[in-house]
Amino acid sequence: MKIEAILFDLGKVLIDFSFETAVQALYASCSISRDRFEEVLWDRAWICRYERGEICTSEFHRYLRQTANLNIDLPDFCKVWSSVFLPGLMVSENLLAWLKRRYPLILVSNTNEAHIEFIRSNYRVLDYFDQHIFSYQVGSLKPDPKIFERAIAASGCPAKALFFTDDREENIVAARRFGMQVHQFQTESKLVEALQQAGVEAGEFVRG
């Protein structure tokens, strides 16, 4: 089926990130062991609640203060927590602009309010997308079906007419179950090849 809309993941597709420096900075303000700190920080129950929007950033910060003895105030926590994002984009603005002129673009991301606030203030990438499906706003994390259902509904297109790219295999598998045309992201050049194979005239972008 002809592609009618294109869906992108955010982290590790559009913007690269690394938690190493942020984790070290947060750990430096704690009074527990590094192993225990990482257990607390990456507790799946709390991270998932945060990224589903069940708790806000201040509540997540309070949890870390109480459980990991984190000695850092909320504004500084937000600054450190958002320092994970690396400069530049993994997909060029030229490609995004080229696609935007021809297709509806939809962003589908597991994320949280602090990270999105930071990205809005420091990158232009969100402006290329017609709709944003953020996990903390819809109450669902990829690869759960609900977030994909929201994305399909937002597109107004049949799932088979959607092209979806994400770096994580489990999300690709979930999207494929809905019938989407999918590509596990590695590089921009491979994404362009996959778009071409799906019938998107991305070759014009390459030639231009």
What is the predicted role of each segment?
Residues 1-4, 112-113, 117-208:
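Asp-based, Mg2+/Mn2+-dependent phosphohydrolase catalytic module
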Residues 1-42, 177:
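Active-site neighborhood of HAD-like aspartate-dependent phosphohydrolases
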Residues 7, 106-108, 163:
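Conserved hydrophobic packing residues within short motifs/helices of P-loop NTPase cores
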Residues 9-12, 53, 99, 107, ...:
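Generic structural signal for small/hydrophobic residues in well-ordered secondary structure
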Residues 21, 25, 45, 59, ...:
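Alpha-helical elements of Rossmann-like donor-binding domains used by nucleotide-donor carbohydrate transfer enzymes
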Residues 30-41, 69-79, 200-206:
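Short, surface-exposed acidic
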Residues 47-90:
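Metal-dependent phosphoesterase signature
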Residues 75-106, 145:
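Short, acidic loop-to-helix structural element flanking the phosphoryl-transfer center
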